[in-house]
Regions:
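A short, well-ordered alpha-helix in the C-terminal region of glycosyltransferases
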Residues: 338-352
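Active-site-proximal region of nucleotide-activated glycan assembly enzymes
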Residues: 39, 49, 60, 119-180
Length: 365
């Protein structure tokens, strides 16, 4: 047994809460740790979606009560230090009780008290930031963490503890075939260009409203697969009325199999959440990003630039998103050879082994 093997942490506590963007990468890492025989537990908030996402995952959940402490009125600001202290003490209790040997924070407010608790107990902390602009909690925790993982380069100031790992993504997406081959096969088969529109689980209204009109004006044969979110299917389909016959449209509230949707698409129009951008790079698909304008610190634009700067994607800010402006971006892209080149550039930016990289860094703590 080498020295390194002896030292590997036997019990790792994951800290991720609030949104799928934090929880899914943490879950990918947790599953990989479990496969390697490491015991895993999860620090969560009582009402967070992580509780639902972790159902049937065979990971014990420990809850601490902490609400967001950024903004939200004077009283909450005054109460915040007491809430944080109470939550930190709860987290310390769990960590002692479980004999936690390493703590991995993936964002969400739960990671703040969790990181402080680990620090107070002398347990090493590693954090992972999914976005190109670090969130509030991770910015604070980066100072006390032993290792800092960033999905995109330049999120944190460079120093020896910062590692660019990429974002952990689902296995089905890392297994998608090479883009050059996929695009070439579609070209050989004489298939019309296939455009995928992803509005996210809620459906991005800006995309549902403006994209159909732009596509109707393009006047080229297209197969369009438009995911519009729950309750928006009828109205979105109605916006395609009066379309030319060569525009084939399939409107769906949800896409069950994202890996299949990516692999069949020549071009995707979507938001620029961290995981979406990472999945598009991993799959290798040309993209037009419409960043969510309300995202904290405009982090979606920063995420989108990661692919746009290398020529793999275009950015259309929501403020200037009209059917006309979108048509102007789309028209020159109606060429599969060009889209194939963009897809190849996207794939060059991918880090498909992100999960393994983060797991290795946890084991080296």
């Amino acid at each position: 047994v080498t020295n390194a093997q002896k030292k590997q942490p036997k019990h790792v506590m994951m800290m991720a809460a609030g949104t799928g963007g934090h929880v899914f990468p943490a879950l990918a890492v947790a599953k990989e740790l479990q496969q390697q025989g490491v015991e895993v537990s999860w620090l969560a908030t009582p009402s967070g979606m992580e509780n639902r996402l972790l159902k049937n995952q065979n990971i014990p959940i420990y809850q601490i009560d902490i609400q967001g402490v950024r903004g939200n009125g004077l009283l909450r600001k005054l109460a915040a230090p007491f809430k944080i202290l109470k939550a930190t003490l709860s987290a310390m209790r769990y960590m002692k009780q479980l004999n936690v040997e390493a703590v991995a924070g993936f964002g969400g407010y739960v990671a703040g008290p969790g990181g402080l608790a680990a620090r107070a107990l002398g347990i090493p902390v590693i954090i992972h930031e999914q976005n190109a602009v670090a969130g509030f909690t991770n910015t604070q925790l980066s100072r006390i963490s032993k290792t800092v993982c960033q999905a995109f380069p330049n999120t944190f100031a460079t120093n020896e503890k910062v590692q660019t790992t990429g974002n952990p993504v689902r296995k089905e997406i890392t297994e998608i075939l090479n883009p050059s081959w996929r695009y070439q096969e579609r070209e050989k088969a004489g298939e019309p260009l296939r455009i995928l529109i992803v509005g996210g689980s809620l459906g991005a209204q800006a995309l549902n409203e403006r994209v159909p009109e732009a596509l109707k004006q393009l006047n080229v044969p297209l197969n369009v697969y438009h995911q519009c979110g729950q309750n928006h299917a009828e109205i979105t389909l109605a916006r395609y009325e009066g379309k030319p016959d060569q525009l084939n449209v399939d409107v769906q509230p949800f896409i069950e199999n994202m890996a299949e949707a990516y692999s069949k698409a020549d071009l995707i129009i979507c938001r620029a959440g961290a995981l979406t951008v990472t999945e598009i790079a991993t799959a290798g698909v040309a993209a037009i990003f419409v960043p969510l304008p309300s995202a904290v610190d405009d982090h979606q634009t920063a995420n989108a630039k990661f692919l746009a700067n290398s020529g793999a994607a275009k950015i259309c800010p929501q403020a200037t998103l009209t059917s006309e402006s979108l048509k102007e971006i789309l028209a020159p892209l109606m060429n599969r050879q060009l889209l194939s080149e963009m897809a190849a550039k996207a794939r060059q930016q991918a880090q498909p082994d992100a999960t393994q990289q983060v797991v290795r860094l946890i084991q080296e703590l």
